[in-house]
Amino acid sequence: INSDFSNETVFNHSHSTKPLFYKISGTWGNHEGSLLLWLLVLTLFIFIFLLRTKKQPKNYRILTSLFQQIIIVGFFIFLLSSSNPFNFIYPTPKEGLGLNPILQDPALAIHPPILYLGYVGSSIIFSSSLSATVLKGINKEWATHIKSWVFASWIFLTLGILLGSIWAYYELGWGGFWFWDPVENVSLMPWLALTTLLHCILVLEKRSNLTSWVVI
């Protein structure tokens, strides 16, 4: 991996002597890079969704992809207009500033990707539920199909929260694994919603009940 310090993001968050692991994780150790990672995961998940739903009705697959693409385009416009990770510096600096030492931690390095897998997995569930609602397909069969996405998103979000809590405990010295601040609460709210959805999906699959709650 080359250290191209003509890129503003690389200059601000990397250094030529930094270990390869932290050069890679430094990509999402900032606002611009984290949004780029978000878009990457969004694109990866829609690709996986299309591979896994070949036996699903064509209209459902197309409509879900359309809703998902709207989300992707929205984030892409926001990325380029306000958080462009591809800004250049001229003349090119000889060395970068390096990543914040607090962020150079194995737990925190893998924390954002895992957390994003949970967040972005929820977008697939959202797009799928919109499609199923439009096509009047919120039923037991749909619940069986989408259940794996709900469960996977819940697992990734749980792991992401745990990793973030462990890192905060021994790095920030808060004296505990949890602190009621917006950074942590913003991941707790989707986790609670996914936990509720998981229970509702199981009820819908087995008893054909709670259809409205699943959509909400």
Language-model segments: residues:
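Polytopic transmembrane helical bundles with strong interfacial aromatic enrichment
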Residues: I1-I216
